[in-house]
């Protein structure tokens, strides 16, 4: 069976994972980096993704897209309050957000597809095989529009999305908690842009989401903004410069704040260095962990309120929680771990990398789907998809065909008509898009109080047991009466548009890969040229003249190749330059060590 990978398509970073020897593993790039920044930029030589794109945040913020996950399955009206936070240009066409890069507009699924293509290519390069199938994770609160947009992104990227699973479920799978017979799990997910808390109930191998809560505008970015405000104020007071008038320098301030926050998870203090605009020198200061925590405490405490609300919604107390799992880079902060442990009364699981845990869990789910997990007995699968009728006579699937059973799915919905007094639930079985082409299983009607459209909160649960018996429950969260519905996205990419994008992705696959390899080779060559040229300038006197001349020749040859269109030639010239400069680099390292140890005793360094 073809390999299935697990993908964490994140707001800030994305990862791809696979199973090896029964254990989930993250796919690294050739430099050993596991995370791909969820950033797409328009450079002079075309669109770039990941680490190289992130570098454009400071140089060209208006042509660099980040946090696109916030816009998946949404229209402009849904994100009005967020528009001021993003330097790039957003428009709307046919109810779909469009992001302008250069002369073209892209939908959020198209941007996300570029990130997925990067992950797909990374996996193919590392594993040495074609990757066409994936499990992708989404936040538990993602509605059907957002889930469908994620599937669309996968299709555009040339991936068959076999399963969309909730991030908290993936985190629990990564820790192997599904091997327990039962239990209640709190998944505390403090990421870059959002905070989510999910309460899961595990019974007989089934994960059920009891409650979710959170804040879509609370994350590590808020901690970064606190540091930015601090640095901007100090720069203004000390140097008389208002960095807010310099967008590129504001990005530099933000990145330095982010780096400092990360360093202080492991260190007690760190040095801040920020280059000032208009060549007015640099701003430096020391920042301690205590200072960061005094700034961050108000933000971190805001995560505890959703936790308490989720516990209340689930009808639980903190002592009822059996396991606590941490997800997201912000949970590395010691203060976060202390407050979470204090709230739930038990130390959280944190031995797995919190940035990687969701992707690892996605790989576990992928392994289950591929039949690779031998210690789990899969009794049966659903032969046909199960879903409900939505607006326009469309079937919306909650439990997909070939889902292992027992299984459950839960979603939150609302109404579309003011004063609506009832909701008709039409349960369907089949694989076709339209209701008329599928098999009708049952109908029921639920009364709801007459409220403005969009106000009712209707929770729908599909539960199919090991005998294949389906139970559908819907609950009006205001009245506690039962109610059920799932909605086909009122906006999103049309089937024709998705198909066209898929066709184009295959039609131009070879051309796209070739162009990408050329861009990557040029970027790597530019970096190697700069570092080698600098090394030669600083330490050329430490090697023989003939050796220095050979390095200069290799530099010239690579510079010429870089301007060409043959990425293989660029890679070859890079290898030649690396070989020519190998001794120089070794001499530089040796010289640096000698100078570092000069005047010290053996006891000082032993």
Question: How would you label these PLM feature ranges?
Answer:
Residues 1-95, 101-105, 109-114, 121-606:
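Oxyanion-binding/catalytic loops of NTP- or PPi-dependent enzymes
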